[in-house]
Amino acid sequence: MTGLMNLTARNCKLFFKDKGMFFTSLITPGILLILYSTFLANVYKESFVSNLPEFFSPSESIIDAMVGGQLVASLLAVCCVTVAFCSNLLMTQDKVSGAIKDITVSPVKGSTVALSYFLASEISTLIISFAALGISLAYLAFCGWYLSAADIFLIILDVFLLTLFGTALSSLIN
């Protein structure tokens, strides 16, 4: 268990120490939100309004909140997977640099090494994804807020599950 904790801590430290990888992972959700809200918000809104029945006309704030919710959902779905791939590049870097040979020589099982990469990638992805969630909730507060505390809890749970999926997918591919 100590070997797993030490390797996981090592992998997390290396991810956050690499400023380029960390900064890219952190700024990507913000850039995507700006691009989504700038270019896709009007397309979503027009599509949403055009598909409403004529006898039903919700207020502009409800439509804006619905469009914002769709944008945030797509942003979080994309970020939880792409950030997982970015944070899992550490495994590839260790293979390229030969550091994995040093790790495999140590008296630690291969499954422990693989699990440490997975856990470190999950922790790193969760931190970045929760930062993206904070940015997204700020955007929703700006364009229209109709969420309850239970909704926020379910969104947090969804982000956690999405990061598990993204990390598992990136670990499987790497």
Q: Where in the sequence are the language-model features?
A:
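Short, membrane-interfacial amphipathic segments enriched in basic
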Residues: 1-9, 166
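Residue-level recognition of transmembrane alpha-helices
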Residues: 7, 25-26, 75, 117-118, ...
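Hydrophobic alpha-helical transmembrane segments of multi-pass membrane transport/permease proteins
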Residues: 10, 14-50, 67-86, 122, ...
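Residue-level recognition of membrane-helix boundary sites in multi-pass small-molecule transporters
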Residues: 20-21, 112, 117
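Perimembrane loop-to-helix junctions flanking transmembrane segments
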Residues: 47-63
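Hydrophobic alpha-helical transmembrane segments of membrane proteins
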Residues: 62-93, 158-171
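Transmembrane helix boundary and interhelical loop/hinge segments in multi-pass membrane proteins
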Residues: 84-108
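Alpha-helical transmembrane segments and their short interhelical loops
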Residues: 110, 118-174
